[in-house]
């Protein structure tokens, strides 16, 4: 079968009689229809024409008629589409021939000029009119679908109503999710005539998927296989030298900047966004160079890139509402004509001009107001001058009216002036020739009215005193003017149920001129101001007196005393010094026979037994020439009192001056006299001799006077600051000299035939063998018996004690048994380990060596928890923390009871008062110098700190201890160190952790400041951590600077360790946690 090269499709179907097949498609839209016809031309006899053509014809109306016919022609070079209407036959040129649609053919195509005459008006064969296209014979043929009017509605032959167009919305046969049985139960969903659709729902299908045409320019998504424009690239034009027009604008304009904004600050702000800028300029007023708050800048790079960066920067600033110095940043891109910049400059200049005009107006107002004030003052001055003249004239009249020793009667008596005054004798010492007002008792009775009531009534007047008397009230004034004013205004005034009639009296010795001149300046002052001036004057007088005392003291100590001491120097009076020394030598020689006789009587005893016998007899007390205090063995009745701290006058001022410059810890701390302990006690004979001070002194003077004098000088120089220790060391040296002298004067006795351990001693009786202390838990074995029994006397005593004891064991060979017992003990490895008289128990099993020898296991770090078990200063962790201890606690207790230093300990309030005086002295010295210097800078915290010291701690390494009791809430010490920034502190912390130092000495003050006491700091850095601390840290301001100060949380005893809670942040990693060693009852176990 051959195909026709031309095929036409019509919806509704139908074949034409000339071999065409046509179908027409109609849509069911109301507003528009899509009408297309696809036509392929095939040769009727089965031959293929070699070409295929398609013709698209669309109409906007559903009722538009389809094309009647179409023709297609082709040649080797082109394709031509032709449409023929029903009005006449259409001709298609094919080679030399021509083809007509109605079937007629001609041999040759007619020319344009002959076509009209060659075509007949009516076709002879078909009978069709060539002009109208109407064939009267059409009615004789059968009407096919091809010959129907396709513009009319097609009638359907199915079940559905043919009058309604429809669309299948849902077809169960096409639903793959349903089974065959379910498909039979479902029905089709059909929509008729586009129901439920409105006009606005009809959209262009090309825009329905994305909503814009941008999808046609971008890459298609994975779901779509459509390539509308095959990814056409967007055009980008780069500005270069050949480009036309202005370049892309990349200049930024910033306006309304605060006046405090600097160019460097703004440049750094722009750089913080990561883009480098150039050509940053601040625009100033050209007239007076005042900043207008406008700046311009450009970004670096080519014009296109810099424009993109500028637009991005402006968008970020507007989104984030960026502020500079509290003002929101206003920014925009300048145009090519600088129109934006010129507008902003003009607005800024207008604002500046308006502000300048406003300032000028305010200045004019201020000058006008000032001029008015000056005019007012001038008028007041003139008025005061006039009043002064009038007052002077009035004073002249007063002089004639008010005279001494006169009395002006009350208004009741018409103010009559009479000579003489009434003044009781006992009140004269209070009034002292001053004017006064007398209120008689018959007008205001003193029994019913008190002086306080009179004071309240006359409160507005500057009276001095109100003196009650049985005759009446006397109101005393310092000024005659004030007295007259009170008399004129208050005379005859009603006072309760009485009338207050007054009499103004002037004493006989009253001097009006002195009184008026002394009170002219204070006339305008009120009574409250006068009282305030009195308080200030009194305080000034007190300060002046104190300053005078200090000045006199300084002159006495720094000027007069050195001159007097120089005048009294021994070098200026050599003859007098020699005479005094000769008198002392003569006195010592006169007393020497008595001393030698006494010594010989004492030293005549040959051995220890005789000395023991003498001990039981009462000793004769020899006469004393000079008594010396505070010897160690001065008797039971005498207490160990410290010698008074006496320093020679010629050195007193020097040491007083040096003590001010010494460490303040020593100044605030009470001094305890050093009491040296002798290694062995002296014998009763020697002690009895030493009890008498006179014998000892005379022995030293007679035997070795020069040596004694030399030793005193050396000791005095070395212990000049502690006279008690000076005297004690002097006493020790004197005792040693006495012992040496006695040993030299004693008779020589030969003890060579006696064993050394049995030879007699001269100091005190002692056992032959040293006693070994024993404990109840010690086993009494063979070694213990051998250590107890030393000689034949001990064995004899032991045999006597064990005579009644019978042994039940049968030991044949005693030596073998003894050797066996010792061997068993040695093999068992039982060893007695003692330290500080305390037996240490066996070690824990975790300390056992795994390899059998600790040397083979190498070195390892011992944890702090294990160090507590064997280190002496760590073992005190469970005892009251008192690490600072003296060599002899009992001796210190005795010294504390005998030497009462309570007078030397000052309270905190007194210390602060002394520190304030010292600070005032420093400020006065700085004012005298007249220049600022760091030498006299005073840190008030160093004067308020408590005496503390550092020592080995029971908690960890070193600790800080209190040297005296500290009350709660008192300041202890300042945490001193190097003040650094936060960034530097982080860097140092990392370096400290790498080197193993740790970061426990870094103390934060605020967000930006940290105090580092690792390498530069005070002793406060030794304070240890404790979960139950005794101190706390506070940050205070001293002279405008922040300081870290340690305060006491509770009462702290002397020698108690100071602790503080470090407050580390808790670590989640167990490997980084630090174990706490404080040992407090509420210990948390870890620092962090």
Curated annotation (Swiss-Prot):
Q: Which spans does this entry mark as compositional bias, Low complexity?
A: 1-10, 27-38, 69-87, 510-529
**UniProt protein name:** Histone-lysine N-methyltransferase, H3 lysine-4 specific
Quaternary structure, per UniProt, is: Component of the Set1C/COMPASS complex.
Q: What does this protein do?
A: Catalytic component of the COMPASS (Set1C) complex that specifically mono-, di- and trimethylates histone H3 to form H3K4me1/2/3. Binds RNAs which might negatively affect its histone methyltransferase activity. COMPASS recognizes ubiquitinated H2B on one face of the nucleosome which stimulates the methylation of H3 on the opposing face.
Looking at the record, the residues that make up the Post-SET domain are: 1072-1088
- Basic and acidic residues bias located where? 365-391
Q: Where is the composition biased (Polar residues)?
A: 101-136, 392-406
GO CC, alphabetical: chromosome; Set1C/COMPASS complex
**The organism of origin for this protein:** Debaryomyces hansenii (strain ATCC 36239 / CBS 767 / BCRC 21394 / JCM 1990 / NBRC 0083 / IGC 2968)
Which reaction equations make up its catalytic activity? Answer: L-lysyl(4)-[histone H3] + 3 S-adenosyl-L-methionine = N(6),N(6),N(6)-trimethyl-L-lysyl(4)-[histone H3] + 3 S-adenosyl-L-homocysteine + 3 H(+); N(6)-methyl-L-lysyl(4)-[histone H3] + S-adenosyl-L-methionine = N(6),N(6)-dimethyl-L-lysyl(4)-[histone H3] + S-adenosyl-L-homocysteine + H(+); N(6),N(6)-dimethyl-L-lysyl(4)-[histone H3] + S-adenosyl-L-methionine = N(6),N(6),N(6)-trimethyl-L-lysyl(4)-[histone H3] + S-adenosyl-L-homocysteine + H(+)
Highest classification ranks of the organism: Eukaryota, Fungi, Dikarya, Ascomycota, Saccharomycotina
């Amino acid at each position: 079968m051959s195909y026709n090269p031309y095929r036409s499709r019509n919806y509704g179907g139908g074949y034409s009689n000339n071999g065409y097949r046509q179908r027409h498609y109609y849509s069911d839209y109301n507003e528009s229809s899509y009408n297309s016809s696809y036509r392929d031309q095939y040769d009727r006899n089965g031959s293929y024409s070699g070409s295929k053509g398609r013709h698209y014809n669309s109409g906007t109306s559903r009722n538009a008629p389809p094309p009647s016919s179409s023709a297609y022609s082709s040649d080797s070079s082109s394709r031509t589409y032709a449409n023929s209407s029903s009005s006449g036959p259409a001709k298609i040129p094919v080679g030399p021939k021509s083809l007509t649609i109605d079937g007629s053919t001609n041999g040759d195509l007619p020319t344009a000029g002959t076509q009209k005459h060659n075509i007949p008006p009516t076709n002879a064969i078909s009978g069709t009119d060539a002009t109208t296209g109407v064939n009267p014979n059409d009615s004789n043929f059968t009407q096919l679908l091809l010959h129907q009017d396709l513009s009319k509605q097609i009638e359907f032959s199915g079940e559905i109503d043919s009058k309604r167009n429809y669309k299948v919305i849902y077809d169960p046969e096409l639903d793959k999710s349903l089974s065959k049985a379910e498909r039979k139960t479902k029905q089709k969903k059909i929509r008729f005539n586009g129901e439920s659709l409105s006009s606005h729902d009809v959209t262009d299908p090309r825009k329905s998927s994305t909503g814009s045409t941008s999808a046609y320019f971008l890459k298609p998504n994975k779901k779509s296989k459509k390539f509308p424009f095959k990814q056409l690239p967007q055009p980008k034009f780069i500005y270069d030298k050949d480009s036309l027009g202005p370049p892309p604008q990349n200049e930024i304009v910033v306006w309304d900047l605060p006046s405090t904004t600097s160019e460097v600050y703004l440049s750094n702000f722009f750089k913080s966004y990561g883009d480098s800028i150039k050509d940053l300029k601040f625009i100033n007023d050209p007239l007076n160079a005042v900043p207008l708050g406008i700046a311009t800048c450009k970004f670096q790079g080519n014009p296109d890139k810099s424009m993109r960066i500028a637009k991005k920067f402006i968008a970020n600033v507007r989104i984030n509402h960026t502020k500079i110095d509290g003002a929101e940043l206003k920014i925009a891109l300048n145009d090519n004509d600088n129109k934006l910049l010129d507008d902003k400059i003009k607005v800024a200049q207008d604002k500046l001009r308006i502000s300048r005009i406003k300032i000028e107006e305010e200045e004019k107002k201020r000058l006008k107001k000032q001029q008015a004030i000056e005019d007012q003052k001038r008028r007041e001055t003139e008025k005061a001058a006039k009043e002064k003249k009038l007052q002077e004239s009035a004073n002249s009249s007063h002089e004639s009216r008010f005279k001494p020793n006169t009395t002006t009667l009350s208004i009741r008596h018409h103010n009559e002036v009479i000579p003489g005054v009434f003044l009781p004798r006992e009140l004269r010492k209070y009034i002292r020739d001053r004017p006064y007002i007398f209120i008689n008792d018959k007008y205001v009775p003193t029994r019913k009215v008190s002086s306080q009531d009179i004071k309240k009534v006359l409160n507005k007047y500057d009276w001095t005193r109100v003196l009650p008397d049985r005759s009446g009230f006397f109101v005393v004034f310092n000024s005659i003017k004030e007295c007259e004013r009170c008399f004129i205004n208050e005379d005859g005034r009603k006072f309760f149920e009485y009338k207050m009639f007054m009499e103004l009296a002037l004493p006989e010795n009253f001097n009006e001129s002195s009184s008026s001149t002394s009170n002219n300046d204070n006339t305008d002052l009120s009574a409250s101001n006068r009282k305030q001036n009195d308080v200030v004057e009194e305080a000034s007088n007190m300060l002046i007196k104190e300053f005078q005392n200090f000045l006199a003291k300084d002159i006495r100590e720094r000027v007069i005393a050195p001159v007097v001491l120089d005048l009294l120097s021994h070098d200026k009076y050599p003859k007098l010094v020699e005479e005094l020394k000769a008198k002392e030598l003569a006195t010592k020689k006169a007393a020497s026979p008595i001393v030698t006789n006494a010594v010989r009587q004492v030293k005549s005893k040959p051995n220890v037994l005789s000395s023991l016998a003498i001990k039981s007899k009462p000793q004769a007390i020899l006469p004393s020439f000079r008594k010396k205090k505070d010897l160690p063995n001065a008797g039971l009745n005498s207490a160990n009192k410290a010698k008074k701290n006496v320093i020679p006058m010629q050195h007193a001022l020097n040491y007083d001056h040096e003590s001010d410059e010494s460490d303040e810890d020593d100044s605030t701390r009470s001094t305890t006299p050093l009491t040296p302990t002798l290694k062995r006690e002296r014998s009763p004979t020697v002690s009895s001799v030493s009890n008498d001070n006179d014998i000892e002194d005379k022995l030293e003077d007679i035997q070795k006077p020069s040596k004694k004098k030399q030793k005193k000088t050396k000791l005095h120089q070395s212990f000049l600051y502690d006279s008690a220790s000076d005297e004690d060391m002097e006493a020790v040296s004197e005792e040693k000299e006495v012992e040496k002298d006695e040993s030299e004067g004693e008779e020589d006795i030969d003890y060579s035939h006696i064993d050394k351990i049995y030879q007699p001693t001269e100091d005190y009786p002692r056992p032959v063998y040293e006693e070994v202390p024993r404990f109840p838990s010690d086993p009494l074995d063979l070694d213990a018996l051998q250590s107890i029994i030393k000689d034949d006397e001990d064995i004899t005593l032991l045999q006597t004690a064990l005579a009644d004891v019978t042994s039940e064991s049968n030991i044949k060979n005693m030596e073998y048994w003894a050797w066996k017992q010792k061997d068993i003990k040695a093999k068992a490895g039982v060893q007695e380990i003692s330290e500080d008289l305390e037996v240490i128990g066996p070690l824990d099993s975790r300390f056992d060596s795994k390899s059998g020898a600790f040397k083979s296991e190498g070195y390892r770090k011992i944890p702090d928890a294990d160090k507590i078990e064997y280190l002496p200063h760590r073992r005190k962790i469970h005892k009251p923390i008192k690490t600072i201890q003296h060599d002899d606690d009992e001796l210190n207790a005795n010294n504390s009871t005998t030497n009462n230093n309570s007078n030397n300990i000052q309270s905190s309030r007194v210390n602060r008062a002394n520190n304030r005086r010292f600070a005032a002295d420093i400020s006065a010295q700085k004012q005298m110098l007249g220049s600022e210097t760091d030498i006299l800078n005073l840190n008030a915290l160093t004067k308020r700190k408590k005496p503390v010291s550092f020592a080995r701690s029971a908690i960890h390494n070193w600790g800080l201890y209190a040297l005296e009791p500290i009350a709660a809430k008192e300041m202890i010490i300042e945490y001193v160190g190097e003040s650094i920034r936060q960034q530097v502190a982080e860097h140092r912390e990392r370096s400290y952790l790498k080197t193993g130092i740790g970061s426990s000495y870094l103390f934060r003050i605020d967000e930006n400041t940290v105090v580092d006491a690792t390498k530069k700091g005070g002793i406060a850095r030794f304070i240890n951590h404790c979960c139950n601390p005794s101190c706390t840290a506070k940050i205070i301001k001293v002279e405008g600077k922040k300081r870290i100060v340690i305060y006491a949380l509770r009462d702290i005893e002397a020698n108690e360790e100071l602790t503080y809670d470090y407050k580390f942040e808790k670590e989640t990693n167990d490997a980084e946690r630090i174990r706490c060693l404080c040992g407090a009852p509420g210990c948390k176990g870890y620092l962090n």
